[in-house]
Amino acid sequence: MSDNTEKKTLRTVEGRVVSNKMDKTVTVLVERQVKHALYGKYIKRSTKLHAHDADNACKEGDVVRVTEIAPMSKTKNWRVVEVITRAAE
């Protein structure tokens, strides 16, 4: 066994909260731009992630930073780290 205890870098992404109807869980929409293979035009692609929100602090429209964690349920393996900007009320 080696004594190398290198820490694995956790994936962190930013996205917008689109649903907070579940208890302690929010749905975060993460958008990215990819270049089309043939035409070279940049296209928006999006992914919806379920993230753990322990304090139920996030509202719809908030921009949040989430990080990857060990699976908490079938679909939830992200955790809200911070709320970057709050939604206008």
Curated annotation (Swiss-Prot):
<comment type="function">
    <text>One of the primary rRNA binding proteins, it binds specifically to the 5'-end of 16S ribosomal RNA.</text>
</comment>
<keyword id="KW-0694">RNA-binding</keyword>
<dbReference type="InterPro" id="IPR000266">
    <property type="entry name" value="Ribosomal_uS17"/>
</dbReference>
<protein>
    <recommendedName>
        <fullName>Small ribosomal subunit protein uS17</fullName>
    </recommendedName>
</protein>
<comment type="subunit">
    <text>Part of the 30S ribosomal subunit.</text>
</comment>
<dbReference type="GO" id="GO:0022627">
    <property type="term" value="C:cytosolic small ribosomal subunit"/>
</dbReference>
<keyword id="KW-0689">Ribosomal protein</keyword>
<dbReference type="InterPro" id="IPR012340">
    <property type="entry name" value="NA-bd_OB-fold"/>
</dbReference>
<keyword id="KW-0687">Ribonucleoprotein</keyword>
<dbReference type="InterPro" id="IPR019984">
    <property type="entry name" value="Ribosomal_uS17_bact/chlr"/>
</dbReference>
<dbReference type="GO" id="GO:0003735">
    <property type="term" value="F:structural constituent of ribosome"/>
</dbReference>
<dbReference type="GO" id="GO:0019843">
    <property type="term" value="F:rRNA binding"/>
</dbReference>
<keyword id="KW-0699">rRNA-binding</keyword>
<comment type="similarity">
    <text>Belongs to the universal ribosomal protein uS17 family.</text>
</comment>
<dbReference type="Pfam" id="PF00366">
    <property type="entry name" value="Ribosomal_S17"/>
</dbReference>
<dbReference type="GO" id="GO:0006412">
    <property type="term" value="P:translation"/>
</dbReference>
